[in-house]
Amino acid sequence: MSNGRVYIVGAGCGDFDLITMRGAEYIRHCDVLVYDSLIDVSLLGFAPETAERICVGKRSGRHSEKQENINEILVEKAREGKTVVRLKGGDPFVFGRGGEEIEALKSADIPFDIVPGISSSIAVPELAGIPVTHRNLSRSVHIITGHTAQDTLPENIKKCAETDGTLVFLMGLRNLPDIAENL
């Protein structure tokens, strides 16, 4: 039996209608849907009734599956010849660990495609009417983690404040007082 294929799909930043048409189409034709808790659950309804649905959690402080286990699920299901959609909140490559997932797929010789999602780093300010770049005001945007894997602030946070661009912090609520103090 030949390997299936994995589609790593960004679900966008909240509402189900912010997913791309391509992402929705892949969900409609999948055999297995591996999804995070951060997605809009309405997206699950796009999958065929026969599709296997696997929730792998991924909420701040409540990771129901370790990343290594998620990688194994993707590889195992694809080796069964199935079409797998890995549905991730936001964009898979903006603090979404999509890079780790494609490394596992490459190591296992599993074919994959990536469907970008709308990242909250751009969409949230935009929906609030705040441009992340603006002619003559902000010529760049910097997306920074609000905490590292060791649950600390990034070491270069003070240098970030010296840029002439817009700073966007993701996953920083718990460290917000420290972030503000260091800027």
Question: Where in this protein do the model-derived segments appear?
Answer:
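Beta-strand/loop-alpha-helix module characteristic of Rossmann-like adenine-cofactor folds
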Residues: 2-6, 112-113, 119-183
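Class I S-adenosyl-L-methionine
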Residues: 1-16, 21-118, 123
